Regions:
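Gly/Ser/Thr/Ala-enriched C-terminal appendages of enzymes
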Residues: 10-174
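Single conserved hydrophobic/aromatic residue that forms the stacking wall/gate
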Residues: 1-9
Length: 174
């Protein structure tokens, strides 16, 4: 019998039935260098992986500088902030928000550490990390920072990523 790390933790602790941050395969690079999306399915909808080679954009309100949402998309997707952007909850797709073009900004927040085995990242100093954390904390709405009943920062999927995920789920066991 083979076991994954999550299985061991699941059997060892009833208080903590899942173990986050475990590596999951998201894509396989084919002979042509293209990434073929793959998916891991779970009974728990939040644990179903998002397939493909991805990046993450943080979306800010242009006037306030506060975070509106994070958007997970394929690494080759680009966005024009002068155009409207439809965001939706990937688990409750009827929950939608339309951001009007020109009212938001976007910043890619995923930084490559290694590319083809070579380190491409210079680690910042502790002082720089503290400064960055303070700056990012200032982009959170007060409702998000409160300890009692805080609002959450929404993490949405691009339409293309959502469609790919849905297609892979629909093709399971076919």
């Amino acid at each position: 019998m083979s076991r994954g790390l999550g299985d061991v933790y699941k059997r060892q602790s009833k208080d903590c039935p899942s173990f986050g941050g475990v590596y999951k395969l998201a894509a396989i690079q084919n002979k042509d260098g293209e990434f073929v999306p793959k998916i891991k399915i779970s009974e728990n909808i939040e644990k179903i992986t998002n397939p493909g080679n991805k990046t993450i954009y943080r979306i800010y309100d242009k006037d306030t500088g506060k975070i509106r949402a994070d958007l997970i998309c394929f690494a080759d997707e680009t966005y024009d902030t002068s155009e409207d952007l439809l965001l939706f909850d990937p688990n409750s797709t009827w929950k939608k928000t339309r951001l009007e073009g020109g009212t938001y900004t976007m910043k890619e927040i995923l930084k490559p550490i290694f590319i083809r085995g070579e380190c491409k990242y210079t680690s910042p100093s502790v002082k720089e990390i503290a400064s960055f954390c303070e700056q990012e904390k200032n982009t959170l709405w007060d409702e998000t920072k409160r300890l009692f009943n805080p609002h959450k920062v929404y993490v949405d999927l691009s339409q293309r990523l959502y469609d790919t995920k849905t297609e892979l789920l629909n093709n399971v066991n076919r």
